[in-house]
Every structure is written in C-alpha cells, then in structure tokens.
Amino acid sequence: MNWIFHLFCAVYGIFCEENSFTIYWNVPTHQCEKLNVSFISLLKELNIVHNKDGNFSGESFTILYSPGLWPSMEHKNITNGGMPQCGNMTLHLEKLEKDVKEKLKDDGYSGLAVIDMESWRPVFRQNTGWMIKYRELTFEQYNKTLAEEYKNNTTNDKLRNRLIKESAEIFEAPAKDFLMNSTELVKKYWKDAKWGYYGFPYCFNMGVAANARNESCPKIVKEENNKTEWLFKSYDYWFPSVYITKVNFTCEERGQLVRGRVTEYQRLRKEFNPKAKIYPYVWFLYNLSNEYLSKEDLEMSLKILKMGKMDGAVIWGSSKNLTKECECKDLYDYVNGTMRTVLEGLKKPENNVKWNGSCQETSDAARYLKNCTDKQ
C-alpha cells in the first residue's frame, strides 16, 4: 500500500515524508490519579508517550530539576556560590550523581532524561532580565571602579561592551565546565538514557517590542550559538522551548516565533550534530496566561514542528494547575477535545503542508483554566 500513499502525495503536491513524530507527556497528571481523574487510557489512545501508571517520572520520561549543586542567584538567594566562577565543581558532581541515582534508580534507564537548569545561561551576554545580577557582580569582579561608573551611566555603550567582553572571560569558562562535566558524568553512569538540557538552543526571536520583531533569531544570537557548538555536540537530545504568547501578538506572529526557532534548530543540528533528536517543549497554555491554546494555535505549533523535521514534541504543564478534581477534569476535557482533534488531524496526509505564514484568529470563545472549588 506504500505506493498508493506516495502516489496520493505526488498527485496533490503535498509533503508526505514518513518521518516519526513522537509526542511526550511532561504534565504532572499523576496528581489527578489521586483525585480519581485518570489520563492513562486517554494518553495511550492518543499515542502520547507517558510513564507507567501515570507517574511523573518513569521509564519513558524523567525531568530532573537542578540536580546537583548548581551555583544560582534565583529568587534573590545566593546558593552554591551564586555564580559559576564561585561554585564547587567537586561537591556539585558528587551531589549530581546522588540526585540522579535517587531519581532514575535503574542504571539501565533508557528513556528521555531532561536536566532543567535555568539558573543562568552559559553565554554571559544572554543573562538578561532577573539574570542581570550575574552581569553586575561579574562586572565588579573584573573592575569595581568601572562597574560603578557604568551603574551611574548605563547609556555608555562603549563601557558596557568592554565590561561584557572582559567579564565573559571570567564567567563563561566555568559555566562551560559545569555544563560539560555534568553531562559527561550522567552519560558515563547512565549510558542508555537519552540525556539533554532543557531550553537549549536559545533564539530570542520575536521580542516583546512590536516594532522590533523578526522571525529570524538575531544575528548576534546565531553567532553565540555557533560559539556554543561544544554544548550542542555534547548530547544528542535537545529540548528547546516554543511557548507562545497571545497578548499583543497576532496569530501570524505566534507562528513566526515557532518557525523562526525551528529554522535555527535545523541549522544548528545540520552544522554541529546531525544525529541530534529535537523535541521542543510545547505548553498547552499561552505564556503568561491561564488561557488554553486555541485549536488553531496548537495545530500551528505542532504542524510547524513536524514539517520542520523535528522528531516530536514534549507537552508541558504545571503542577500548580492540577491540585483539584475540577482542574483535572478541565484539562482532561481539553486533551480529549481540542488536543485529540489536532493530533488526529496531524496524521492525515492532506494536512502535511507547510505553514504559509498566514492565519486567522479563532472565532471560538477563549477557554481559560477553570477557576473552581471542589465539593465543600
């Protein structure tokens, strides 16, 4: 019957490459099992890879949140030295091995294993937002006088560029060591696990300012990604993020965000690690919102990933939204309705056409997380 499939594709001029596209479940619906709302049969029916008995961590998929002793200044708390150049590598690796043993247990674990370390970024310049603290303290390590001068005149671009260049020499080498030594250790003891870091590669396309949005990753970020090739060569499973925002973004812009990032993932894989498998994270909510993705946006996101030769996707969700029976039922209805429709549609050859850059906002009423209380 294969020839019929390919004939159909040729006649209608559509893309029908029979590539595997696997959906993984990284949503803590094990909490719902305790509330008598089971997702197990539904996920199995939809061919979404999940762990046995609905467990959050298990034989198919495990995420490890900052295992070890990563230097961090998250939440305004300085822990484990705060910055990579102040961390203790020996203690970190000892704790990392212990934490992974407790989480995976089985030395022969062969599922996806995601290390989620979001305390800082190895490219010094990319530490923005709350991470700006790493810049400020490293500036002071380099030269307190110049750091103070810049603090009093942040419009001095020449001084800023000098501080970033010199401070990167202090920060980036130990940051690289922490990332590389960590993957080397876990790959040594858990050889069959499919290791990777969450978040990488970064792109930073389609910025917040509407007049400065571009589908492509900024040129400087591409250059920085090229210099970070050591990271992309060190593990073969990539877990970047394609979360989309609704407020102040058109549906076309949301699609451009996903497509621009997929283009960069393709480029980096081709140049630095052709055997890498890429499973971008997709959140079923709009970023910074309690609104579910519309059918159109969920379909757009997954279709761009599939047509962009990604190997699949990881569906993510937060535990804080699944603490009550009614919240679990609400998500179940979304998966059984909207997500089912989208996933079944992706299997049809006639739907395997590349996103053309245009779309129409859904006319359906917005659907939000249910603000509910269980039986009193």
From Swiss-Prot:
Female salivary gland (at protein level). Disulfide bonds join C32-C328, C203-C217. It is an enzyme of class 3 (hydrolase). InterPro entries: Aldolase_TIM, Glycoside_hydrolase_SF, Hyaluronidase. It comes from the Eukaryota. Its main location: secreted. Optimum pH is 6.0. GO terms for molecular function: hyalurononglucosaminidase activity. The keyword Hydrolase applies. It catalyses: Random hydrolysis of (1->4)-linkages between N-acetyl-beta-D-glucosamine and D-glucuronate residues in hyaluronate. Its EC number is 3.2.1.35. Pfam families: Glyco_hydro_56. Residues 1-16 form the signal peptide. GO terms for biological process: carbohydrate metabolic process; hyaluronan catabolic process. The active site is at E118 (proton donor). Keywords: Disulfide bond, Glycoprotein, Glycosidase, Hydrolase, Secreted, Signal. Glycans are attached at residues 36, 55, 77, 88, 143, 153, 181, 214, 226, 248, 287, 321, 336, 356, 371. It is found in: Secreted. Glycosylated; glycosylation is critical for enzymatic activity. Enhances dermonecrotic lesions caused by venom serine protease from Crotalus oreganus helleri (hemorrhagic factor). Immunization against the protein protects mice against L.major infection; protective immunity is abrogated in B-cell-deficient mice indicating that antibodies against the proteins play a significant role for disease protection. Belongs to the glycosyl hydrolase 56 family. Hydrolyzes high molecular weight hyaluronic acid to produce small oligosaccharides. Up-regulates expression of CSF2, CSF3, LIF, CXCL1, CXCL2 and CXCL8 in cultured human dermal microvascular endothelial cells. Promotes host neutrophil recruitment at the injection site. This is Salivary hyaluronidase. It comes from Lutzomyia longipalpis (Sand fly).
